[in-house]
A protein has these predicted regions:
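ATP/NTP phosphate-donor binding region
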Residues: 1-91
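Solvent-exposed alpha-helices and their adjacent loops that cap or buttress functional pockets
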Residues: 6-8, 30-31, 84-87, 108, ...
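C-terminal charged capping/lid subdomain of soluble metabolic enzymes
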Residues: 7, 37, 280-345
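Short glycine/serine/threonine-rich phosphate/pyrophosphate-binding segments
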Residues: 21-24, 44-48, 99-106, 124-128, ...
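A short, small-residue-rich loop immediately preceding and capping a beta-strand
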Residues: 81-122, 238
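A glycine/threonine-rich phosphate-anchoring loop and its flanking beta-alpha core
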Residues: 106-188, 195-196, 272-275
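Active-site segments that bind and position negatively charged phosphate/pyrophosphate groups
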Residues: 182-289
Length: 345
């Protein structure tokens, strides 16, 4: 049975197919993206040489913060003020990882342009309406958006070297795991999260040379779908703040924190986290070692370069996030967060 499929969901189309990148120009045209601006990176373009030729314009997205990057590119791709009544904004196609896709979503939220995403990592950004907005344009936006079209090529999404792939896979697993205990958790998001966890764990247990990359990629899509539906919780609050204030890398920070966060939550929310343990082939009291195993025994935050001098500031910032008020159990304290993070240091 082929793992390829087309998923139509409330106006969004997801095409999951081996070779989707090679067929991207035709698939884009088939779904109304005839003339488009392509946002990408040199690395991603090297894996899709024909796509740049099909684009009306190509814009490289450098490293940086999403609001600043989106603001800079907005000036380039936006229809001038006087033309807005006479012309529709040119669609945007994002070929790359989470940064590229989030920049496209941010611009689309301002201009009204349709957005298509062709992910080259397991960031999950292609499945969510979670993104920052262009700096200086926040008052021009009614809300955030998700791509209308996703072209998911499993080989492209899982092409990283083994250590990086494991960190990205745990990050993808975390998307679903964090959605299991929020106020918006529902049967659909729960099913997607648990299916994602099972698929990712099964693939990571395999020999790297024989790994089910389609399973990893599907797990990434489903986990991000669950997060988009039910929202985020403790794990993402901790990771996002550590990355922003303490300077640790994104995927690796998730790989270090998730085992400790889920072990912490297994005590507070056994009815939510117990099924997660079962999905990855373990028991609730063995979640931490199992997730560490799946992550390839990831490095601690200290080894990742996190700035311990800013940890108190980071914890105070975490406690201000509204999502923590909904974490099951007694109200979280500074000591709770400090202990969780210290275990991952």
């Amino acid at each position: 049975l082929s793992p390829d499929f087309v998923w139509r969901d409330a106006g969004r189309v997801v095409v999951f197919r081996d070779g989707a990148i090679d067929a991207a120009a035709g698939l884009l045209a088939e779904h109304g993206f005839d003339s488009f601006s392509l946002l990408s990176t040199d690395r991603a373009l090297a894996g899709a040489p024909g796509l740049a030729d099909a684009a009306a314009a190509v814009h490289l997205v450098p490293s940086g913060q999403i609001p600043d990057l989106a603001s800079d590119l907005l000036r380039v791709v936006e229809i001038p003020d006087g033309m807005r009544l006479e012309a529709q904004p040119r669609p945007l196609v994002a070929l790359g990882g989470g940064r590229v896709i989030d920049v496209a979503k941010a611009i689309g939220a301002v201009t009204g342009a349709r957005v298509a995403a062709i992910p080259t990592t397991m960031s999950g950004a292609e499945m969510t309406a979670i993104h920052r907005l262009p700096a200086g344009a926040e008052d021009r936006v009614a809300g955030t958006i998700r791509p209308d079209l996703v072209l998911a090529d499993p080989e492209a999404m899982t092409s990283q070297p083994e250590p990086d792939l494991r960190a990205s896979s745990i990050n993808a697993l975390a998307h679903g795991a964090d959605s299991l205990y929020t106020p918006l958790t529902n049967p659909v998001s729960e099913w997607a999260a648990l299916r994602a966890a099972a698929a990712i764990a099964a693939a990571l247990d395999e020999d790297p040379g024989e790994r089910d990359r389609a399973g990893l990629a599907l797990g990434s899509l489903l986990g991000a779908y669950a997060l988009d539906s039910a929202g985020l919780g403790l794990h993402h609050v901790v990771c996002q703040t550590l990355v922003r204030l303490c300077g640790s890398p994104h995927a690796e920070t998730n790989a270090a924190i998730l085992p400790r966060a889920m072990a912490f939550l297994a005590v507070r929310a056994p009815e939510a986290i117990g099924p997660l343990a079962a999905a990855i082939g373990t028991y609730p009291d063995r979640l931490e070692p199992r997730l560490l195993e799946l992550g390839g025994e990831p490095a601690g935050l200290g080894s990742l370069g996190a700035d311990r001098d800013r940890l108190d500031e980071a914890i105070e910032a975490m406690l201000q996030r509204p999502q923590l008020a909904h974490v099951p159990g007694p109200p979280l304290t500074k000591a709770d967060l400090a202990e969780l993070i210290d275990r991952a240091w």
